[in-house]
């Protein structure tokens, strides 16, 4: 009798302990978003907060860039791994390319960044981002790639993405560190982490003429529901004072 009682008590304990595990709701929604596949220039149709965004790509460089550089363009091409994913589709694949040359060796760099209406445009990420990945074509030069993002405090963070001293296509995956602040409680501050652009630096001893790089399919993985809460839509209600917001002193208000 005692043995049966012990068995019943043990089963009851297991049920009580396991109950919260099964009853606990899961607020995580892990999704993958494509920022740009470069197949339709200026027609990304990227969705964020119910709005559609499109952009172009520009390149800025350091002072010793050679005359007539950098050069950019969209070209036919696709990594073999991506081609297999679209096997059988009647689709024209494009990549975005940059060709650079500098007048001398040293700490040279150029940045590839999105623009809209002729101005730099930072692409907002949906939710809390855990990682980014993209395809890049290396020419074997000892150059270094960096990814630039802006956190919810308005500070640009530079994430190293490794060397470009390889030939052909390579899938680069970078994790977004947990110490980067991706949301802010300030209603007047940035809503989310944003993508600023890529920066490519030359090694001080590497050749700086005739360098070429290509980009394809930039995407990211995110917990898309992490910043959504009950009543989220009320956050953007207009009280009729939006036109007067510039009259409030930022120093006095914050």
Question: What label would you give each PLM region?
Answer:
Residues 1-9:
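Bacterial N-terminal signal peptides that target proteins for export
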Residues 9-18:
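Bacterial N-terminal signal peptides
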Residues 23-254:
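Beta-rich carbohydrate-recognition modules and glycan-binding surfaces
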């Amino acid at each position: 009798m005692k043995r049966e009682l012990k068995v019943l008590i043990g089963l009851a304990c297991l049920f009580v302990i396991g109950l919260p595990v099964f009853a606990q709701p899961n607020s995580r929604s892990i999704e993958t978003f494509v920022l740009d596949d470069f197949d339709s220039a200026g027609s990304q149709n990227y969705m964020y907060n119910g709005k559609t965004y499109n952009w172009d790509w520009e390149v800025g460089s350091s002072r010793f860039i050679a005359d007539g550089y950098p050069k950019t363009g969209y070209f036919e091409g696709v990594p073999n791994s991506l081609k297999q994913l679209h096997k059988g589709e009647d689709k024209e694949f494009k990549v975005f390319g940059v060709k650079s040359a500098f007048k001398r060796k040293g700490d040279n760099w150029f940045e590839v960044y999105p623009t809209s209406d002729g101005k730099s445009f930072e692409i907002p990420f949906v939710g809390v981002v855990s990682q980014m990945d993209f395809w890049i074509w290396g020419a074997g030069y000892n150059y270094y790639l960096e990814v630039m993002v802006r956190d919810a405090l308005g500070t640009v963070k530079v994430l190293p993405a490794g060397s470009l001293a390889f030939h052909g296509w390579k899938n680069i995956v970078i994790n977004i560190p947990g110490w980067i602040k991706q949301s802010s409680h300030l209603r007047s501050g940035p809503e989310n982490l944003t993508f600023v652009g890529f920066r490519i630096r030359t090694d001080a001893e590497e050749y700086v003429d005739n360098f070429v790089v290509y980009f394809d399919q930039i995407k990211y993985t995110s917990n898309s529901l992490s910043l959504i809460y009950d009543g989220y839509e009320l956050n953007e209600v207009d009280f009729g004072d939006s036109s007067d917001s510039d009259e409030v002193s930022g120093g006095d208000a914050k």
